[in-house]
């Protein structure tokens, strides 16, 4: 029995069309809260034994074909506000990273590193996303969140355990808002810089394909703060290339010809195709280099039940 809500609560919702890779089976339930109070009430009344999975826009996610045995919480319009207060940029967790970068730039505040990061602010914080030498950890002041028990809390950045492509947020904790400190900049110059970033990204990454961004973490060369070590040249895409896996395929899944660390749905892929190809890449890169790549894309859910 699910608690009453003011938002939308749907049983058995197929998640494929909510992920960038367009794969995935059904969630037991999908909850889209109306606002933070609705989320607090729902989690506070939900049976503690029921798993909860916060989901953003699905830009860095493979949901397995058997679906997800959990309540998936997906924030929407009630959580996408962006406001500027002095040197602080406060963004709802559902606000897109690119929108936050643009709004900040229009106000003369520099969060340009967010412009080409796919996804929403909640996911960016959870993964300590970064680009062009800047990471969320470099700018984040604090977040608002709702715990699995249904308590609204404010957490300083220092308590989030932000490191390279990861954080230590408690399981089931749903981020609702993030506050960043942003340096001043000329709006025209910030806009020009973002245009350059977009051009650079579009010339080197398969932005017109169905992908989930970088597939594997760069294997080394990052400090515990998540800041890049500029003296280290080891990159996942180089290891994949050296193993002869650029363009490798399994079913409808492919390692991009344009950028070999991008796993794409080339047409009709299942989650099993995508995850299976990724695991094959890990195996063959290890055989080639002795280095074991780690997934950057999150994989969740169950394998499909064999009905034969």
Swiss-Prot record:
Active site: 165, 214, 296
Basic and acidic residues bias (residue ranges): 197-211
Cofactor(s) this protein cannot do without: FAD
Catalytic activity: UDP-N-acetyl-alpha-D-muramate + NADP(+) = UDP-N-acetyl-3-O-(1-carboxyvinyl)-alpha-D-glucosamine + NADPH + H(+)
Organism superkingdom: Bacteria
GO BP, sorted A to Z: cell division; cell wall organization; peptidoglycan biosynthetic process; regulation of cell shape
Segments traversing the membrane: none
UniProt region (Disordered), positions on chain: 197-228
Alphabetized UniProt keyword annotations: Cell cycle, Cell division, Cell shape, Cell wall biogenesis/degradation, Cytoplasm, FAD, Flavoprotein, NADP, Oxidoreductase, Peptidoglycan synthesis
Enzyme class: oxidoreductase
HAMAP family: MurB (MF_00037)
Role summary: Cell wall formation.
Protein's recorded name: UDP-N-acetylenolpyruvoylglucosamine reductase
């Amino acid at each position: 029995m699910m608690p009453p809500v003011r938002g939308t609560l749907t049983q058995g919702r197929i998640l494929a069309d909510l992920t960038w890779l367009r794969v995935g089976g059904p969630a037991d339930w999908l909850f889209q809260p109306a606002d933070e109070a609705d989320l607090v009430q729902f989690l506070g009344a939900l049976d503690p034994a029921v798993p909860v999975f916060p989901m953003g826009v699905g830009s860095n996610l493979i949901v397995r074909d058997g679906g997800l045995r959990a309540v998936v919480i997906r924030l929407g319009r009630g959580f996408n506000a962006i406001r500027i207060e002095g040197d602080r940029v406060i963004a709802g967790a559902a606000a897109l990273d690119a929108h936050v970068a643009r709004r900040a730039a229009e106000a003369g505040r520099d969060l340009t590193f967010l412009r080409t990061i796919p996804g929403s602010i909640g996911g960016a914080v959870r993964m300590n996303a970064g680009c062009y030498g800047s990471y969320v950890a470099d700018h984040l002041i604090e977040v608002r969140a709702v715990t699995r028990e249904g308590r609204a809390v404010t957490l300083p950045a220092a308590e989030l355990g932000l490191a390279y492509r990861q954080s230590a947020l408690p399981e089931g904790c749903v981020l609702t808002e993030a506050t960043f400190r942003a340096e001043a900049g000329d709006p025209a110059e910030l806009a020009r810089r973002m245009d350059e970033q977009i051009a650079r990204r579009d010339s080197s990454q398969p932005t017109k394909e169905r992908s989930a961004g970088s597939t594997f973490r760069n294997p080394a060369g990052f400090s515990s703060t998540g800041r890049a070590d500029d003296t280290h040249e080891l990159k996942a895409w180089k290891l994949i290339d050296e193993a002869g896996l650029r363009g490798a395929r399994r079913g409808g899944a492919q390692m991009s010809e344009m950028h070999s660390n991008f796993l794409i749905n080339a047409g009709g892929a299942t989650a099993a195709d995508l995850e299976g190809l990724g695991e094959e890449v890990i195996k063959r890169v290890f055989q080639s280099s002795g280095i074991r790549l780690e997934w950057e894309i999150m994989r969740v859910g169950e394998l499909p039940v064999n009905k034969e």
